[in-house]
Amino acid sequence: MKLLLTIFLIHLSCLLSGQPNKETKAVAADTISTANERLSRQNYNLPEIQITAYRTSGELKSTAGSVSVISADRLENSAVNIVSSLSTVPGIVMQEGTLGTVKLTLRGIGSRYPYGTKKIKLFFGDIPMYSAEGETTFDDINPEYLSRIEVLRGPASSIHGASLGGTIILYPRRAEFNIEEIKLNSSIGSYGYFKNGASYSNGTPKNDLLIALSGIQSEGYRENNKYNRNSFFINQNQLFSKKLSGNLVLSGSKIRAQIPSSIDSATFANHPQKAAANWLNTKGYEHPDRIFAGYSLRYQMPRDWEFSSSVFLNSRKTEENRPFNYLDESGFAYGGRILSQHTKKQGSTTLHFLAGTNLYFENVRSSLSENIGGKGTKGVLQQKGKESIYQTDLFTQLEAKIKRITITGGVNFNLSGFQYIDQFTSDTINQSGNYNFTSILAPRLSISWNILNDIYFYTSVNKGFSIPSLSETLSPLGLINRDIKPEKAWSFEGGFRASLLNHATFIDLAFYYMRVTDLIVPKRVAEDVYVGMNAGSSLHRGIEVTLQQWIIGRKRSDTDRHFALIANLNYATNRYNFQNFTDNNIDYSGNKLPGMPDQTFSGSLDLKTPIGFYTQFELNTSDKIPLNDLNSQYSKGWLVMSMKAGYIFEIFKKLKIDATIKINNLTDEKYASMVVVNAPGTSSRPPRYFYLGLPRWFTCTLNLTYQDFKK
């Protein structure tokens, strides 16, 4: 905290000492409105959304791929983390057992893993947020630190590495130009929920700075369900010259979360507030800490060339008390990216070329200790080791825009491997070894065709892959399985996007077909032990639809606030099946992948009024979900609604006050917000498949924003 305060004071003194020049004053006068005008600056036609994930800035409607964008306005609906925002993306199934137990699947990828998010890459700007084990966590990401999210559905990004499920890119929030701003917010809610946040930002012509702090705590609805998180975020952008700029991002979080774990069907029906008995006895918890930093430089070179480079550090440490053992783990990742790109225009043709490399290294130390009697007392060491992993991606991409047609071709070349050193010498098994995976070439080809005005068709072919983690490569005897192969998939997509009725309507329709081969299936060999095996293939097919509609309201001027009614609808229907899978002499071919509903739907209706009053109604539904490979048991489908009402007003044109109240799970639906697939069970102990979704609960929030517009 002392270091943070020192950084805050140094930057603050530097920024306050800088004065905008006359040229900047003129620009500011033309582009920056007063605080009252900013309240009304809502585009009453749907704005043209820009996509930058492919490193070729363009409009969403003309992008040749399945991409979804979550704006800052939508992120404001996520109180604790980005879970509720991501759940509105068609193709994503987001499950939240507790505030600290989150699982995301994208187009069915990773559905068979009982916990956590696998085979989907997450980036915070250019900083990788996934671990050496290939796992991504979402529960410690504060939506207030973000300006938008871009979701690439399917293995479509040769630039970020063609991950099997897709890529999620978080774009950090930054200070607004020529505005000094202080924000304070506080929320209180049911089940002991409490949140405080504060941020300071200052934007000047040559640099801008944003510093934010946040704290969240909750008693939880269930037993052994307390949660506490503190986090900070710093984002600074510096313009060194007309051609050279730099960006620094620094963020960290500290979480203390109890674990109630999943429950069986009888407990779910009769005593859903109870924790699993063994987790309650040991007072199970997880204590993850994380800090990450990244610095990037961008240089505009002669003849329309641009060079950029970035480096990152990502440090994490966690302690987890579980009924079967204690886990202590720490990881330190580092790496960087180098990228060159060039744009050339000739007549009606525009060519955009880029090439670069991503480097990722991580060292992980972990140990398992006995939990004596499952009562929470740490015992003797059972396992200890060190893992070093590397991933190198070389990529290139060429985009050609020829009148109404855009053709994009790209390729990613991946080299990956790891070394494991077994530091536990009390047994006869030595798990030490090196493993270098066969290099993988993942191409991408896409075509976008502007058939009429704002109507576009696109098609793409992509190859994706997923590298096995260390735990997946170890055999039941603890030896490295050198026969295991990376998963691979070819994905075929087609889609249609249109902006209609004077940009009041936006439609996004996508079809996809993906076949995953060398399918890595996690096989449970103990309550906490899974090993991987290549087990045939799976088939993933689906349709995804997004509709945005301004029902009432049009923009007449920047200074007027008008009545507006906006609808957002997202729907996905899919068929995910084992195509060829046999385990323990049982043939599961043709069965549905467990953990995935056939249909999901989310929608919202937003009302805005000239007097500052606004409301939002949200609805989310899910079809029933198969709970095991046999498809012999299903969880019930559900429909959950929420409603929010708020009022915005200003004092002295500089202070904006926003007060809201939200009712979550409006109808008090009893549903499973997360399921644990293939949960083990016996005749005396039924399988614990279910996490309970919270009953009806309330939050009240007060936001204060002070803005000083520089002249």
Which residue ranges define each predicted feature?
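C-terminal beta-signal and adjacent terminal beta-strands/loops
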Residues: 562-565, 624-626, 647-711
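N-terminal periplasmic accessory domains that precede
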Residues: 37, 48, 82-85, 103-105, ...
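Structural signature of Gram-negative outer-membrane beta-barrels, strongest in the C-terminal barrel
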Residues: 346-362, 385-515
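Gram-negative outer-membrane beta-barrel transporters
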Residues: 401, 511-515, 533-625, 703
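Short acidic/polar hinge/loop motifs at secondary-structure boundaries
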Residues: 127-153
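Face-selective signature of the C-terminal outer-membrane beta-barrel domain
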Residues: 239-253, 284-425, 508-511, 547-550, ...
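Membrane-embedded beta-barrel scaffold of Gram-negative outer-membrane proteins
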Residues: 306-312, 316-319, 450, 456-462, ...
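Transmembrane beta-barrel wall of Gram-negative outer-membrane proteins
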Residues: 181, 188-217, 222-260, 285-301, ...
